């Protein structure tokens, strides 16, 4: 799983679980969450706390 694949999967806002099923079915949700947090710190993605959705920044 790469940052590029995660960004490509964010063609629309998705939940962490939704991203996992698109990018790496059967993978670790913790791994996706960790990568998303790193990408958020870099300003690549944002999280809507009210809706629970990740999207491109």
Language model features with spans:
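Short capping segments at the starts of secondary-structure elements
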Residues: 9-18, 27
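Residues within the alpha-helical elements of helix-turn-helix
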Residues: 22-24
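Short, cationic-aromatic polyanion-contact patches
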Residues: 47-57
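Short, leucine-enriched amphipathic alpha-helices that occur as contiguous helical runs
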Residues: 2-7, 29
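Short amphipathic alpha-helical interaction segments
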Residues: 26-38
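Glycine-centered, phosphate/nucleic-acid-interacting loop/turn motifs that mediate DNA/RNA or nucleotide
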Residues: 43
């Amino acid at each position: 799983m790469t940052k590029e694949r995660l960004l490509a999967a964010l063609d629309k806002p998705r939940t962490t679980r939704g991203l996992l099923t698109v990018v790496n079915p059967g993978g670790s949700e913790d791994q996706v969450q960790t990568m998303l947090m790193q990408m958020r710190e870099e300003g690549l993605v944002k999280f809507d706390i009210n809706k629970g959705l990740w999207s491109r920044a």
